[in-house]
Amino acid sequence: MMVEGAWNLGVSGAGVAVTILDDGIEKDHPDLIRNYDPLSSTDVNDNDSDPNPRYDFSDSNRHGTRCAGQVAATPNNTLCIVGIAFNAQIGGIRMLDGQVWTSSHKTERNKKVFASSIL
């Protein structure tokens, strides 16, 4: 994605919180745990604060974790990738794979920017 230029200017996501609205994120994933933000996370399907995906026999609910890694994966940890905004706080709202609703979350969580793309 050619982000090195932004990184060279000191842009790293510091001071920004990003929330992924998807099938959940693995909050304890080694690439995400350092930047995990519980205040930007919830599970609307089970009505609790744990954004971890529901894994079944197909093991298919990993999309949110992958998206979160592309945004805020920790650099230099001997794992796979570095996130584009590697110093951003990352949260997840587990809303897919169950009941879907989004409109009240912007107000409830006092977020200035709210975007949701669900295909």
Model-derived segments and spans:
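Active-site core segment of subtilase-fold serine proteases
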Residues: 1-119
